[in-house]
Amino acid sequence: GKPVVWTMHDMWPCTGICHYARECTNYQQECHNCPYIYKGGSKKDLSYRTFRKKQKLYSNAPVHFVTCSRWLKEQAQVSRLFEGKSVINIPNAINTNLFKPQNKEEARAKCMLPQNKKLILFGSVKITDKRKGAEYLIEACKLLAEKHPEWKESLGVVVFGNQSQQLQEQIPFHVYPLPYIKNEHEVVNIYNAVDLFVIPSL
C-alpha cells in the first residue's frame, strides 16, 4: 500500500525481459515472440509471461517511475505496462566539488599520458557494447586520419573500460587503453587530462 518511487537505469521495468529493446517495439503493446530469445521465442515465451506478471504487479501498486534521461522517459511512456503511471525525468546529479577543471599537465602525469599530444577520450564499462557506439568512433577517426594525415603523430585517443585494448588495431591514431575505472578521483584525472570527450552512444 505504501507509495513506491522506482528509479530506472534501463528499460527492464517497462519491457518483458530485456534491458534495452533496441529495434523491438513489442513492449509498447505486449511482449511475445522475443527477438532476443533463442529462435525468436514464441507466443507465450518468457518475455510474454514476465510482461503479464509485471502488468499484474503494477496494476494496483502506487508506483512512480523516475528516469535518468529524457530518452528513457520517452521509451517508458509508450509501454503498455506504464499506462496510467507517473513517469518523470530527474537527471543524475554531478558533484561539482569533485568534477571540476584542474591542471591538465598534472592530470596527464597522474594518468601516465603524453604531454605533447592532443588527446580524445572515449569511455564505457565495456568498450565492445554496441550501444556505446565504438564503431562510429572508429569510423570518425579513420575519416579524420584521411583528411588530416599530418595529425597522425600529434593526436592520440584515450580509451577507458573493459576490453579497451581491442581498439588499438582499429583506430589509425595512437591509442592509450586504460581499464574500467570505478574510482571517481581517477575518472576526474582522466577527464582533465584530455582535450576532447567523445560520446558516440546510440
Where are these regions (language model features)?
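Short hydrophobic "strand-cap" motifs at the C-terminus of beta-strands
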Residues: C68, I90-A93, F122-K126, F160, ...
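Active-site proximal beta-strand in glycosyltransferases
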Residues: K2-Y38, H64-V66
